Amino acid sequence: MSNLEQAERIKNLTKDHHNWMKNSLNLIASENITSRAVREAVASDLSHRYAEGLPGERLYEGCDYIDAIEEETIALSKKLYDAEHVNVQPTSGVVANLASFFALTKPGDLLMSINVPEGGHISHASVSAAGIRGLKISSVPMDDSIMNVDIDKTLSKIREKEPKAIVLGGSLFLFPQPVSEVADVAKEVGAKIIYDAAHVLGLIAGKRFQDPVKEGADIVTGSTHKTFPGPQGGIILCKEEIGRKVDNCVFPGVVSNHHLHHMAALGVATAEMLEFGKDYANQTISNAKALAQALYERGFNVLCEDQGFTESHQVAMDVAKLGDVSKMAKTLQYNNIILNKNLLPWDDVNDSDNPSGIRMGTQELTHRGFKEDEMDQVAEFIKQVVMDKKDVKEDVTEFMQDYTTVHYAFDEGCEGYDYIEF
Protein backbone atom coordinates (compact mmCIF):
# COMPACT_ATOMS: atom_id res chain seq x y z
CA MET A 1 0.00 0.00 0.00
CA SER A 2 1.41 3.40 -0.99
CA ASN A 3 1.61 6.36 1.36
CA LEU A 4 -1.24 8.01 -0.54
CA GLU A 5 -3.34 4.88 -0.26
CA GLN A 6 -2.70 4.73 3.47
CA ALA A 7 -3.76 8.36 3.81
CA GLU A 8 -6.93 7.58 1.86
CA ARG A 9 -7.55 4.57 4.09
CA ILE A 10 -7.40 6.79 7.18
CA LYS A 11 -9.81 9.22 5.54
CA ASN A 12 -12.22 6.42 4.67
CA LEU A 13 -12.02 4.95 8.17
CA THR A 14 -12.90 8.37 9.54
CA LYS A 15 -15.88 8.55 7.20
CA ASP A 16 -16.95 5.10 8.36
CA HIS A 17 -16.73 6.31 11.95
CA HIS A 18 -18.98 9.29 11.15
CA ASN A 19 -21.54 7.00 9.57
CA TRP A 20 -21.45 4.58 12.51
CA MET A 21 -22.00 7.40 15.00
CA LYS A 22 -24.93 8.68 12.94
CA ASN A 23 -26.52 5.23 13.06
CA SER A 24 -25.86 4.62 16.76
CA LEU A 25 -27.45 5.36 20.11
CA ASN A 26 -24.45 6.93 21.81
CA LEU A 27 -24.94 6.90 25.57
CA ILE A 28 -21.31 7.48 26.56
CA ALA A 29 -21.61 9.98 29.41
CA SER A 30 -18.42 11.85 28.52
CA GLU A 31 -19.14 12.64 24.87
CA ASN A 32 -21.30 14.98 22.81
CA ILE A 33 -21.68 16.44 19.35
CA THR A 34 -21.14 20.07 18.41
CA SER A 35 -22.85 22.46 16.06
CA ARG A 36 -21.48 23.17 12.59
CA ALA A 37 -20.33 26.60 13.79
CA VAL A 38 -18.18 24.96 16.46
CA ARG A 39 -16.81 22.45 13.96
CA GLU A 40 -15.91 25.28 11.57
CA ALA A 41 -13.82 26.97 14.26
CA VAL A 42 -12.00 23.69 14.96
CA ALA A 43 -11.19 23.41 11.23
CA SER A 44 -9.89 27.00 10.98
CA ASP A 45 -6.34 28.27 10.41
CA LEU A 46 -6.02 28.61 14.18
CA SER A 47 -5.20 24.90 14.23
CA HIS A 48 -1.86 25.83 12.66
CA ARG A 49 -0.91 28.59 15.11
CA TYR A 50 0.85 29.08 18.44
CA ALA A 51 0.25 31.47 21.31
CA GLU A 52 2.09 31.17 24.61
CA GLY A 53 1.05 33.29 27.57
CA LEU A 54 -2.01 35.44 28.25
CA PRO A 55 -3.64 37.90 25.83
CA GLY A 56 -1.42 40.98 25.56
CA GLU A 57 1.51 39.09 27.09
CA ARG A 58 2.34 36.61 24.31
CA LEU A 59 5.79 35.24 23.67
CA TYR A 60 4.97 34.96 19.95
CA GLU A 61 4.14 37.64 17.40
CA GLY A 62 1.13 37.27 15.12
CA CYS A 63 -1.41 36.96 17.94
CA ASP A 64 -3.55 40.08 17.48
CA TYR A 65 -6.69 38.23 16.40
CA ILE A 66 -5.92 35.33 18.73
CA ASP A 67 -5.83 37.76 21.66
CA ALA A 68 -9.21 39.17 20.66
CA ILE A 69 -10.71 35.68 20.34
CA GLU A 70 -9.41 34.59 23.73
CA GLU A 71 -10.59 37.78 25.44
CA GLU A 72 -14.05 37.32 23.91
CA THR A 73 -14.17 33.66 24.98
CA ILE A 74 -13.18 34.58 28.54
CA ALA A 75 -15.82 37.33 28.67
CA LEU A 76 -18.53 34.96 27.43
CA SER A 77 -17.47 32.35 29.99
CA LYS A 78 -17.55 34.85 32.85
CA LYS A 79 -21.06 35.80 31.80
CA LEU A 80 -22.24 32.21 31.46
CA TYR A 81 -20.93 31.04 34.84
CA ASP A 82 -21.03 34.38 36.67
CA ALA A 83 -17.38 33.73 37.52
CA GLU A 84 -14.81 36.23 38.75
CA HIS A 85 -11.89 34.69 36.85
CA VAL A 86 -11.75 32.23 33.95
CA ASN A 87 -8.86 30.45 32.25
CA VAL A 88 -9.69 28.80 28.93
CA GLN A 89 -6.22 27.41 28.20
CA PRO A 90 -6.25 23.89 29.74
CA THR A 91 -6.19 21.31 26.97
CA SER A 92 -8.32 18.84 28.95
CA GLY A 93 -10.16 18.45 32.22
CA VAL A 94 -7.25 16.47 33.67
CA VAL A 95 -4.84 19.28 32.74
CA ALA A 96 -7.21 21.72 34.47
CA ASN A 97 -7.14 19.51 37.57
CA LEU A 98 -3.35 19.28 37.48
CA ALA A 99 -3.00 23.07 37.22
CA SER A 100 -5.38 23.43 40.18
CA PHE A 101 -3.31 21.02 42.26
CA PHE A 102 -0.20 23.05 41.45
CA ALA A 103 -1.99 26.27 42.39
CA LEU A 104 -3.34 25.14 45.76
CA THR A 105 -0.93 22.48 47.05
CA LYS A 106 2.70 21.46 47.31
CA PRO A 107 4.26 17.98 47.25
CA GLY A 108 3.51 16.03 50.41
CA ASP A 109 0.25 17.84 51.14
CA LEU A 110 -2.88 15.84 51.92
CA LEU A 111 -5.69 15.81 49.37
CA MET A 112 -9.12 14.39 50.17
CA SER A 113 -10.94 13.01 47.14
CA ILE A 114 -13.61 10.48 46.23
CA ASN A 115 -12.48 6.92 45.47
CA VAL A 116 -12.85 5.90 41.83
CA PRO A 117 -15.39 3.07 42.42
CA GLU A 118 -17.53 5.52 44.40
CA GLY A 119 -17.59 8.02 41.55
CA GLY A 120 -14.29 9.86 41.74
CA HIS A 121 -12.10 10.48 38.71
CA ILE A 122 -8.75 8.83 38.23
CA SER A 123 -7.03 12.24 38.08
CA HIS A 124 -7.92 12.70 41.76
CA ALA A 125 -5.92 9.58 42.63
CA SER A 126 -2.26 8.85 43.29
CA VAL A 127 -1.86 7.08 39.93
CA SER A 128 -2.72 10.23 37.98
CA ALA A 129 -2.62 14.02 38.33
CA ALA A 130 -2.75 14.08 42.14
CA GLY A 131 0.17 11.67 42.25
CA ILE A 132 2.12 13.71 39.70
CA ARG A 133 1.86 16.64 42.11
CA GLY A 134 3.16 14.36 44.88
CA LEU A 135 0.04 14.57 47.02
CA LYS A 136 -0.98 12.16 49.73
CA ILE A 137 -4.54 10.92 49.24
CA SER A 138 -7.28 10.29 51.77
CA SER A 139 -10.79 9.34 50.69
CA VAL A 140 -13.91 11.46 51.06
CA PRO A 141 -16.41 9.24 52.93
CA MET A 142 -19.38 8.35 50.75
CA ASP A 143 -22.85 7.03 51.45
CA ASP A 144 -23.13 4.41 48.73
CA SER A 145 -26.87 4.00 49.27
CA ILE A 146 -27.45 7.54 47.97
CA MET A 147 -24.38 7.78 45.70
CA ASN A 148 -23.30 10.95 47.44
CA VAL A 149 -21.00 12.35 50.09
CA ASP A 150 -21.62 11.21 53.66
CA ILE A 151 -21.78 14.69 55.11
CA ASP A 152 -21.31 13.90 58.81
CA LYS A 153 -18.37 11.54 58.27
CA THR A 154 -16.76 13.89 55.77
CA LEU A 155 -16.95 16.95 58.00
CA SER A 156 -15.54 14.94 60.89
CA LYS A 157 -12.68 13.65 58.74
CA ILE A 158 -11.83 17.14 57.48
CA ARG A 159 -11.49 18.36 61.05
CA GLU A 160 -9.41 15.31 61.95
CA LYS A 161 -7.09 15.18 58.93
CA GLU A 162 -6.86 18.91 58.11
CA PRO A 163 -6.22 18.39 54.38
CA LYS A 164 -4.71 21.09 52.20
CA ALA A 165 -7.40 20.62 49.55
CA ILE A 166 -10.61 18.67 48.99
CA VAL A 167 -11.89 17.54 45.60
CA LEU A 168 -15.61 17.15 45.01
CA GLY A 169 -17.24 16.07 41.78
CA GLY A 170 -16.24 13.09 39.69
CA SER A 171 -17.04 10.78 36.82
CA LEU A 172 -20.06 8.88 38.18
CA PHE A 173 -22.07 11.91 39.18
CA LEU A 174 -25.80 11.45 39.69
CA PHE A 175 -26.61 14.21 42.19
CA PRO A 176 -25.35 17.62 43.32
CA GLN A 177 -22.87 17.34 46.17
CA PRO A 178 -22.82 19.28 49.48
CA VAL A 179 -20.32 21.97 48.49
CA SER A 180 -21.47 24.65 50.92
CA GLU A 181 -21.43 22.32 53.93
CA VAL A 182 -17.94 21.06 53.09
CA ALA A 183 -16.67 24.57 52.32
CA ASP A 184 -17.74 25.89 55.72
CA VAL A 185 -15.69 23.27 57.56
CA ALA A 186 -12.82 23.48 55.07
CA LYS A 187 -12.38 27.13 56.02
CA GLU A 188 -11.97 26.11 59.66
CA VAL A 189 -8.85 24.09 58.83
CA GLY A 190 -7.55 26.24 55.97
CA ALA A 191 -8.43 23.76 53.23
CA LYS A 192 -9.38 24.73 49.67
CA ILE A 193 -12.23 23.22 47.65
CA ILE A 194 -11.71 22.05 44.07
CA TYR A 195 -14.93 21.06 42.30
CA ASP A 196 -14.43 18.83 39.27
CA ALA A 197 -17.34 19.74 37.01
CA ALA A 198 -16.07 17.84 33.98
CA HIS A 199 -19.26 15.82 33.60
CA VAL A 200 -21.79 18.43 34.67
CA LEU A 201 -20.35 21.67 33.26
CA GLY A 202 -23.12 21.99 30.69
CA LEU A 203 -25.78 21.44 33.36
CA ILE A 204 -24.16 24.10 35.55
CA ALA A 205 -24.07 26.42 32.53
CA GLY A 206 -27.77 25.73 32.00
CA LYS A 207 -28.56 26.59 35.64
CA ARG A 208 -29.95 23.10 36.25
CA PHE A 209 -27.48 21.45 38.59
CA GLN A 210 -25.72 23.37 41.34
CA ASP A 211 -23.57 26.50 41.36
CA PRO A 212 -20.30 25.38 42.97
CA VAL A 213 -18.72 28.83 42.69
CA LYS A 214 -21.55 30.42 44.67
CA GLU A 215 -21.60 27.50 47.11
CA GLY A 216 -17.99 28.02 48.13
CA ALA A 217 -15.64 26.17 45.79
CA ASP A 218 -12.32 27.97 45.40
CA ILE A 219 -11.71 26.44 41.98
CA VAL A 220 -14.08 24.78 39.51
CA THR A 221 -12.50 22.71 36.75
CA GLY A 222 -14.32 21.31 33.77
CA SER A 223 -14.21 19.55 30.43
CA THR A 224 -15.72 21.44 27.53
CA HIS A 225 -16.97 18.43 25.57
CA LYS A 226 -19.22 16.33 27.82
CA THR A 227 -22.51 17.87 28.90
CA PHE A 228 -20.97 21.10 27.66
CA PRO A 229 -21.30 20.66 23.87
CA GLY A 230 -18.02 22.20 22.81
CA PRO A 231 -14.62 21.12 21.53
CA GLN A 232 -12.25 18.83 23.40
CA GLY A 233 -10.61 20.89 26.13
CA GLY A 234 -10.70 22.14 29.70
CA ILE A 235 -11.59 25.27 31.64
CA ILE A 236 -10.95 26.70 35.11
CA LEU A 237 -13.25 29.05 37.03
CA CYS A 238 -11.98 30.60 40.24
CA LYS A 239 -12.03 33.56 42.57
CA GLU A 240 -10.16 36.65 41.40
CA GLU A 241 -7.80 36.54 44.37
CA ILE A 242 -6.17 33.34 43.11
CA GLY A 243 -6.67 34.01 39.40
CA ARG A 244 -3.12 35.04 38.58
CA LYS A 245 -1.72 32.08 40.48
CA VAL A 246 -3.99 29.73 38.55
CA ASP A 247 -2.98 31.36 35.26
CA ASN A 248 0.71 30.87 36.07
CA CYS A 249 0.11 27.22 36.90
CA VAL A 250 -1.58 26.72 33.54
CA PHE A 251 1.15 28.58 31.62
CA PRO A 252 4.02 27.99 31.92
CA GLY A 253 3.05 25.28 34.41
CA VAL A 254 1.26 22.55 32.46
CA VAL A 255 0.33 24.07 29.08
CA SER A 256 2.45 25.65 26.35
CA ASN A 257 0.31 26.36 23.29
CA HIS A 258 -3.34 25.92 24.20
CA HIS A 259 -4.85 24.60 20.94
CA LEU A 260 -6.21 27.87 19.58
CA HIS A 261 -8.77 26.31 17.25
CA HIS A 262 -10.40 24.65 20.25
CA MET A 263 -10.35 27.93 22.15
CA ALA A 264 -12.22 29.71 19.35
CA ALA A 265 -14.67 26.82 19.13
CA LEU A 266 -15.20 27.08 22.89
CA GLY A 267 -16.14 30.73 22.47
CA VAL A 268 -18.77 29.82 19.87
CA ALA A 269 -20.13 26.98 22.01
CA THR A 270 -20.29 29.29 25.04
CA ALA A 271 -22.34 31.82 23.07
CA GLU A 272 -24.68 28.99 22.07
CA MET A 273 -25.03 27.90 25.69
CA LEU A 274 -25.90 31.45 26.73
CA GLU A 275 -28.69 31.28 24.15
CA PHE A 276 -29.91 27.68 24.46
CA GLY A 277 -28.26 26.24 27.58
CA LYS A 278 -31.23 26.31 29.93
CA ASP A 279 -33.53 24.43 27.56
CA TYR A 280 -30.78 21.96 26.69
CA ALA A 281 -29.89 21.25 30.32
CA ASN A 282 -33.55 20.87 31.32
CA GLN A 283 -34.18 18.37 28.54
CA THR A 284 -30.97 16.46 29.21
CA ILE A 285 -31.93 15.85 32.84
CA SER A 286 -35.57 15.10 31.97
CA ASN A 287 -34.34 12.56 29.44
CA ALA A 288 -32.05 10.92 32.01
CA LYS A 289 -34.93 10.59 34.45
CA ALA A 290 -37.18 9.17 31.74
CA LEU A 291 -34.54 6.66 30.63
CA ALA A 292 -33.93 5.54 34.21
CA GLN A 293 -37.64 5.08 34.87
CA ALA A 294 -38.15 3.16 31.63
CA LEU A 295 -35.25 0.83 32.40
CA TYR A 296 -36.47 0.33 35.98
CA GLU A 297 -39.95 -0.59 34.73
CA ARG A 298 -38.36 -3.20 32.46
CA GLY A 299 -36.69 -4.91 35.40
CA PHE A 300 -33.23 -3.37 35.45
CA ASN A 301 -31.56 -2.57 38.77
CA VAL A 302 -31.25 1.19 38.24
CA LEU A 303 -29.48 2.87 41.14
CA CYS A 304 -31.15 5.35 43.50
CA GLU A 305 -34.79 4.67 42.62
CA ASP A 306 -35.93 6.20 45.92
CA GLN A 307 -34.19 9.47 45.00
CA GLY A 308 -35.65 9.72 41.53
CA PHE A 309 -32.64 7.92 40.00
CA THR A 310 -30.67 11.01 38.94
CA GLU A 311 -30.48 14.79 38.84
CA SER A 312 -27.81 14.86 36.13
CA HIS A 313 -27.35 13.50 32.62
CA GLN A 314 -26.22 10.14 33.97
CA VAL A 315 -28.02 6.89 34.68
CA ALA A 316 -26.30 4.01 36.48
CA MET A 317 -27.35 0.35 36.68
CA ASP A 318 -26.01 -2.69 38.49
CA VAL A 319 -26.29 -5.46 35.91
CA ALA A 320 -23.87 -8.01 37.39
CA LYS A 321 -26.69 -10.51 37.96
CA LEU A 322 -27.51 -10.44 34.24
CA GLY A 323 -24.15 -11.80 33.13
CA ASP A 324 -20.64 -10.74 32.20
CA VAL A 325 -20.84 -6.93 32.08
CA SER A 326 -17.88 -6.53 29.75
CA LYS A 327 -19.44 -8.90 27.21
CA MET A 328 -22.78 -7.15 27.70
CA ALA A 329 -21.28 -3.79 26.75
CA LYS A 330 -19.67 -5.31 23.66
CA THR A 331 -22.95 -6.95 22.62
CA LEU A 332 -24.76 -3.65 22.99
CA GLN A 333 -22.09 -1.99 20.88
CA TYR A 334 -22.56 -4.59 18.16
CA ASN A 335 -26.21 -3.51 18.14
CA ASN A 336 -25.21 0.17 17.76
CA ILE A 337 -25.96 0.96 21.41
CA ILE A 338 -22.79 2.50 22.78
CA LEU A 339 -22.28 2.90 26.52
CA ASN A 340 -19.62 1.95 29.03
CA LYS A 341 -19.14 -0.60 31.75
CA ASN A 342 -18.41 1.17 35.01
CA LEU A 343 -17.15 0.47 38.51
CA LEU A 344 -19.73 0.79 41.27
CA PRO A 345 -18.99 1.47 44.95
CA TRP A 346 -19.10 -2.23 45.87
CA ASP A 347 -16.55 -3.17 43.17
CA ASP A 348 -12.83 -3.55 43.74
CA VAL A 349 -10.89 -0.83 41.92
CA ASN A 350 -8.93 -3.56 40.12
CA ASP A 351 -12.11 -4.97 38.54
CA SER A 352 -12.45 -2.20 35.97
CA ASP A 353 -12.29 -4.72 33.10
CA ASN A 354 -15.45 -6.44 34.33
CA PRO A 355 -17.26 -4.34 36.92
CA SER A 356 -20.85 -4.51 38.13
CA GLY A 357 -22.17 -1.40 36.51
CA ILE A 358 -23.21 0.32 33.34
CA ARG A 359 -23.12 4.11 33.06
CA MET A 360 -25.17 6.04 30.52
CA GLY A 361 -25.53 9.70 29.61
CA THR A 362 -28.33 11.41 27.70
CA GLN A 363 -26.54 14.59 26.59
CA GLU A 364 -25.67 13.59 23.02
CA LEU A 365 -29.09 12.11 22.30
CA THR A 366 -30.64 15.28 23.70
CA HIS A 367 -28.48 17.32 21.34
CA ARG A 368 -29.92 15.18 18.53
CA GLY A 369 -33.48 16.09 19.49
CA PHE A 370 -34.47 13.17 21.73
CA LYS A 371 -37.16 13.75 24.34
CA GLU A 372 -38.87 11.58 26.93
CA ASP A 373 -40.80 9.38 24.49
CA GLU A 374 -37.61 8.47 22.64
CA MET A 375 -36.00 7.48 25.93
CA ASP A 376 -38.63 4.80 26.37
CA GLN A 377 -37.62 3.32 23.02
CA VAL A 378 -33.95 3.46 24.03
CA ALA A 379 -34.78 1.46 27.15
CA GLU A 380 -36.71 -1.05 25.06
CA PHE A 381 -33.76 -1.56 22.71
CA ILE A 382 -31.45 -2.15 25.70
CA LYS A 383 -33.89 -4.66 27.18
CA GLN A 384 -34.21 -6.52 23.89
CA VAL A 385 -30.45 -6.94 23.67
CA VAL A 386 -29.60 -7.66 27.32
CA MET A 387 -32.64 -9.60 28.52
CA ASP A 388 -34.29 -10.92 25.36
CA LYS A 389 -31.01 -11.67 23.53
CA LYS A 390 -32.31 -10.11 20.32
CA ASP A 391 -30.37 -8.52 17.48
CA VAL A 392 -31.69 -4.97 17.06
CA LYS A 393 -28.88 -3.41 15.02
CA GLU A 394 -31.02 -2.79 11.95
CA ASP A 395 -33.89 -1.46 14.07
CA VAL A 396 -31.58 0.96 15.88
CA THR A 397 -30.04 2.14 12.62
CA GLU A 398 -33.46 2.78 11.09
CA PHE A 399 -34.68 4.55 14.24
CA MET A 400 -31.70 6.91 14.30
CA GLN A 401 -32.29 8.23 10.78
CA ASP A 402 -34.86 10.68 12.15
CA TYR A 403 -32.31 12.14 14.59
CA THR A 404 -29.23 13.12 12.62
CA THR A 405 -29.31 16.91 13.10
CA VAL A 406 -28.07 19.17 15.88
CA HIS A 407 -30.49 20.99 18.20
CA TYR A 408 -29.90 23.80 20.73
CA ALA A 409 -27.54 25.63 18.35
CA PHE A 410 -27.53 28.77 16.19
CA ASP A 411 -27.46 26.56 13.10
CA GLU A 412 -30.14 24.21 14.41
CA GLY A 413 -31.08 21.55 11.93
CA CYS A 414 -27.60 21.13 10.47
CA GLU A 415 -26.33 17.59 10.06
CA GLY A 416 -24.38 16.47 13.09
CA TYR A 417 -22.41 13.57 11.62
CA ASP A 418 -21.57 14.54 8.06
CA TYR A 419 -17.91 14.36 7.08
CA ILE A 420 -16.81 17.85 6.07
CA GLU A 421 -14.51 17.81 3.03
CA PHE A 422 -12.49 20.75 1.74
Swiss-Prot record:
The modification N6-(pyridoxal phosphate)lysine is found at residue 226. It is an enzyme of class 2 (transferase). The keyword Amino-acid biosynthesis applies. It is found in: Cytoplasm. Keywords: Amino-acid biosynthesis, Cytoplasm, One-carbon metabolism, Pyridoxal phosphate, Transferase. The keyword Cytoplasm applies. Its cofactor is pyridoxal 5'-phosphate. One of its GO terms (molecular function) is pyridoxal phosphate binding. This is Serine hydroxymethyltransferase.
